[in-house]
């Protein structure tokens, strides 16, 4: 829509969102780059959304972001923070503890901003180094390495209080484009 209107839109509690949360049985909200302007705005938005959902339904919301590390780190980019390394870089290390540490740091970052779910971990097995959208979003082209690293990341997110939404399986594969 902003490409058509020339407008960018930052979601705030004043945009009718809270009325919607108080009226409808919403289970979750996904926030993207256009919903983010400052750390304070994001924290207020997520706090206000949780309060509205709790008041209406008695249970909180899933508040979802997508922070994979590397090139897919919307919040880090918008807020001027440095993201964790990409899955590809971490996978090349062969060290699952580095993956756990990166996922734990991302979980802490997300919780601080009010997110409790992350559209990550990519469990895709890289089919080629080029010609695919996945690229460094995959831990490896080796299924065993991907499984080990994805499980390490998934566990670290859960231990850190963030629900990981594991994606790209059975695989994005060698598809060109999303």
Map each language-model feature to its residues.
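Enzymes and membrane/adaptor proteins characterized by extended Gly/Ser/Thr/Asp/Glu-rich
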Residues: 7, 20-146, 173-178
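Substrate-gating cap/lid alpha-helix
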Residues: 149-150
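Boundary/entry segment of secreted carbohydrate-active catalytic domains
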Residues: 1-13
């Amino acid at each position: 829509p902003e490409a058509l209107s020339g407008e960018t839109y930052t979601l705030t509690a004043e945009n009718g969102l809270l009325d919607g949360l108080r009226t409808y049985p919403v289970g979750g909200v996904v926030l993207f780059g256009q919903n983010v302007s400052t750390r304070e705005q994001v924290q207020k938005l997520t706090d206000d959304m949780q309060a509205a959902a709790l008041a209406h339904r008695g249970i909180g919301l899933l508040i979802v972001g997508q922070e994979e590390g590397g090139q897919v780190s919307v919040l880090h980019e918008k807020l001027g923070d440095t993201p964790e390394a990409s899955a590809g870089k971490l996978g090349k290390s062969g060290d699952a503890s580095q993956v756990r540490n990166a996922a734990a740091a991302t979980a802490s970052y997300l919780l601080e901003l009010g997110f409790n779910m992350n559209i990550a971990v990519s469990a895709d097995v890289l089919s080629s180094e080029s010609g695919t959208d996945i690229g460094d979003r995959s831990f490896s082209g080796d299924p065993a390495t991907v499984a080990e690293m994805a499980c390490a990341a998934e566990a670290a997110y859960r231990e850190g209080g963030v629900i990981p939404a594991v994606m790209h399986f059975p695989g994005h594969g060698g598809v060109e484009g999303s």
